[in-house]
A protein has these predicted regions:
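Substrate-recognition element of Asp-dependent hydrolases with the DxDx(T/V) motif
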Residues: 73, 91-121, 131-132
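Residues within well-ordered alpha helices
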Residues: 30, 57-60, 97, 119-120, ...
Length: 218
């Protein structure tokens, strides 16, 4: 039996390997068409998204307008329809085992419902019990704790019955805001600044998917 009744999973670079395979390449293609002088490296892209989210990076580091941010998201939606990120090895087994034991699987992500739905169907053959995605709007997306509060309300759960799993600080901030345990998806990390922060602040830090699996069912 698993330690928790509900997993609340980030999507990009937690369940699927997306930054290097989809999100950054889409960003490069779009920014080279609009502001080639503002191109940043993959490492800087990841650091900026960690520190202030994708939208914050676009506003504060790249100085894009709101229209340009929205256009960039639409560009990404088209790009990702034909560029599908692979799931991390082992996640299929973890999620199937968790569901078989009666566990709930929810997603809180800055990705879109369309892509989360497709990725779960293709990689795992089922849909999450609840999804909280880009379409919520900025006011209710991570790091706002709306998703966790709504999950607890809908499924009559206490904070300690959930586990938030994310590679980014906004998931950590959301979990902390409502007392939900937080596990860091360290298997996607290579930046020492990100690793140091998440090791120091997360309830649990896992360097590999297999270590997360051992903890969850241990």
């Amino acid at each position: 039996m698993a330690r928790y009744r509900c997993l609340v999973l980030d999507h990009d670079d937690t369940v699927v390997r997306s930054a290097e395979t989809v999100n950054y390449p889409a960003f490069v293609e779009n920014i080279m068409q609009t502001h080639p002088d503002r191109l940043i490296s993959l490492a800087e892209f990841n650091r900026q998204c960690f520190e202030q989210s994708y939208t914050g990076m676009c506003r504060n580091a790249l100085h894009l307008t709101e229209d340009e941010i929205n256009d960039g998201f639409e560009f990404w939606k088209v790009y990702v329809r034909t560029h599908i990120p692979p799931a991390y090895d082992g996640f299929d087994r973890i999620l199937r085992r968790f569901r078989a034991g009666g566990g709930l699987i929810c997603v809180s992500s800055h990705s879109s419902v369309e892509n989360i739905t497709r990725d779960y169907e293709r990689n795992f053959g089922f849909q999450p019990d609840a999804m909280y995605a880009w379409e919520l709007g900025e006011a209710l997306r991570k790091p706002d704790p709306y998703a966790l509060h709504d999950i607890m309300r809908r499924f009559s759960l206490r904070p300690e019955e959930l586990l938030m799993v994310d590679d980014m600080k906004n998931g950590y901030d959301m979990a902390r805001a409502c007392g939900v345990p937080f596990a860091c998806a360290g298997w996607s990390h290579s930046d020492p600044v990100i690793i140091d922060f998440m090791r120091k602040n997360s309830d649990f830090y896992f360097e590999s998917v297999s270590a997360f699996e051992d903890f969850l069912f241990g």
